Amino acid sequence: MTQTTTSQTASADRRAWGWGLATVHEDGGVLDTWYPEPQLGCPDDSSAPADLHRVTEAGRDAIRNVHTEVVHTVIDLDAAPVDVSDAYLRLHLLSSRLAIPRTINLDGIFGVLPNNAWTTIGPIRMADLEKARMEARIAHAPFTVLLIDKFPRMVDFVVPTGVRIGDADRVRLGAHLAVGTTVMHEGFVNFNAGTLGHSMVEGRISQGVIVGDGTDIGGGASIMGTLSGGGKERVTIGRGCLLGAEAGIGISLGDNCVVEAGLYVTAGTKVTLPNGKVVKASELSGASDILYIRDSTTGIVKARGRGNHKIELNSDLHQN
């Protein structure tokens, strides 16, 4: 059994732990770790579930050059992940709804996780892929490469209750899907991102993005994340919003907002208010009750109040 402990000094409410099964390469490197029942808080005195030990009795997998080990992992949620098993526990917490996005430290996770070939017989180290393919054919074992990535499909590790997922390849482990969420076939949810309530997702929810209850992400819609382009701002969408088909945002939306189909509103987009004033969209970030549209004759982006509400600028941006 392997044990990973990142901190003994973290407070109980900022710790998590779990018994898991690690896939270990013959050179000692860990490919992945599955935690059937991750827990928050300090670990209890329980021993590893018997079923986990039963899995390890199968011994070495000659096709993949791996074996499984029972691991006991205890982590500090405020510290950065230190190894593969630590990182996988954090991703399990998110997809198991034990932590919401942006509440646990994932700094450096890309450097910790290995890039695996995820196949129908489990993860395989990239250097072993072609040999494993040949060995599988010799053994007449069905063999399909599903994806090559550092992050696996969520449903191969965690299946949250009360959700629908049209294409499992498009939801990464570490996604947070609340009860009542539907991710259609063209939808996508990254790790450390997701929904907090009932939502229809037909577009892309990027890393770090949080979507509120009753909000729909239209087909082909895009929400800027923090993984590409060096962006630091994390986008939050409030309750009861609609991001139209092929629309996109690089600012946060409050509650009851609509971005019309095909309109992409970035932080620097010039927006004309009902009183004729022109502001950067960033000054409206987080504001509620706004309809964003583009005038089809002039191309001007306009913001209109919804439900008899006046548009209010983000006051934080005007404090010196």
From Swiss-Prot:
Annotated active site: E202
Keywords attached to this entry: Acyltransferase, Amino-acid biosynthesis, Cytoplasm, Diaminopimelate biosynthesis, Lysine biosynthesis, Magnesium, Metal-binding, Transferase
Cellular compartment(s): Cytoplasm
Residues reported in the UniProt entry to bind succinyl-CoA: R204, G219, S222, A245, E260, A261, G268, K280
Keyword Coiled coil: no
Cysteines joined through disulfide linkages: none
Gene Ontology MF terms: 2,3,4,5-tetrahydropyridine-2,6-dicarboxylate N-succinyltransferase activity; magnesium ion binding
EC number, UniProt record: 2.3.1.117
Primary location class: cytoplasm
Binding site for Mg(2+) 2: E186
A GO BP entry: diaminopimelate biosynthetic process
Entries under Gene3D superfamilies matching the protein: 3.30.70.2010, Hexapeptide repeat proteins, Trimeric LpxA-like enzymes
Gene Ontology CC annotations of this record: cytoplasm
Catalytic reactions on record: (S)-2,3,4,5-tetrahydrodipicolinate + succinyl-CoA + H2O = (S)-2-succinylamino-6-oxoheptanedioate + CoA
Residues that hold Mg(2+) 1 according to the record: D169
KW Cytoplasm (keyword) present: yes
Classification via Pfam families: Hexapep_2, THDPS_M
Pathway: Amino-acid biosynthesis; L-lysine biosynthesis via DAP pathway; LL-2,6-diaminopimelate from (S)-tetrahydrodipicolinate (succinylase route): step 1/3
Domain of life assignment: Bacteria
Function text: Catalyzes the conversion of the cyclic tetrahydrodipicolinate (THDP) into the acyclic N-succinyl-L-2-amino-6-oxopimelate using succinyl-CoA.
Family: Belongs to the type 2 tetrahydrodipicolinate N-succinyltransferase family.
Subunit structure: Homotrimer.
Protein name according to UniProt: 2,3,4,5-tetrahydropyridine-2,6-dicarboxylate N-succinyltransferase
Gene transcribed to yield this protein: dapD
